[in-house]
Curated annotation (Swiss-Prot):
Family: Belongs to the DapA family.
Record organism: Cereibacter sphaeroides (strain ATCC 17029 / ATH 2.4.9)
Keywords: Lyase
Enzyme class (EC, first level): lyase
NCBIfam families: KdgD, PRK03620.1
Alphabetized SMART domains for the sequence: DHDPS
Record pathway: Carbohydrate acid metabolism; D-glucarate degradation; 2,5-dioxopentanoate from D-glucarate: step 2/2
Coiled coil feature spans: none
Pfam short name (any one): DHDPS
InterPro entries in the cross-refs: Aldolase_TIM (IPR013785), DapA-like (IPR002220), Dehydro-deoxyglucarate_dehyd (IPR017655)
Keyword Lyase attributed: yes
GO molecular function, one term: 4-hydroxy-tetrahydrodipicolinate synthase activity
The organism's place on the tree of life at top rank: Bacteria
Protein's name according to its UniProt entry: Probable 5-dehydro-4-deoxyglucarate dehydratase
Amino acid sequence: MDPQQIKAALGSGLLSFPVTPFDAENRFAAAPYQKHVEWLSGFDAPVLFAAGGTGEFFSLTPDEIPAIVRAAKESAGKTAIVSGCGYGTEIARGIARSVEAAGGDGILLLPHYLIDAPQEGLYAHVKAVCQATGMGVMVYNRDNAVLQADTLARLCDDCPNLVGFKDGTGDIGLVRQITAKMGDRLTYLGGMPTAELFAEAYLGASFTTYSSAVFNFVPALANKFYAALRAGDRATCESILNSFFYPFMELRSRRKGYAVAAVKAGVRLVGFDAGPVRAPLSDLTGEEEEILKALIDAHRE
């Protein structure tokens, strides 16, 4: 898939990022992963992000990532697969090349490791990764890797395969400046934790889609919310926010890392063998899983 094709796919509907299942020995479990990806691909997501943030990219080795991408491609049907990519520049370049060799359709460039960097350094990092692959690249603006509008414009000038921008800062002023400056040069995705909580604000800033974590275990509900959002049906959006997303937010906020662990628990609760989260995260308690189960059961479509 060429960069412009993945750019179009990213903007064509609701997106998600499958959790990465691990077995009893803490190894990637391909068979249950493929079963889950196949199920998700039946709910019309144009793109799934393999080995993304909710897929515990931060806990994966670079060698595991292409194996996950291959497993996703084999089971996703016509759904495009974009892989997580990141760490230091040279590691990220290597991951990008390995994802392309594994048949991936693009990469999501997550923040580099640990250190803060000036805009010129961020520019050099993103440019180097873009130049390592012919695939479309999406940058994830968050934490220690926040590109300003002028830096992003330079990158778009110099990197024709930079086609997407995902925001995890929540800084609506900055993202509106970026969409005003960049226009249709990029596809824009909301990327805050539990993105539905922020979707209406981002829609006002010209972000027409986002990646939904809960799509992993309640895809029909996620699609219902997204359809209402795009139709301007505020009553339906508020009903789902109050009955599902705000209670889920309360559970997710109980402990650091639950933005991932709660999603993985949800996948297990709807019948998939997702396994545990890897350290340094921790799984929900039994009591918390019961709370989540009741929430899911009340919203089965």
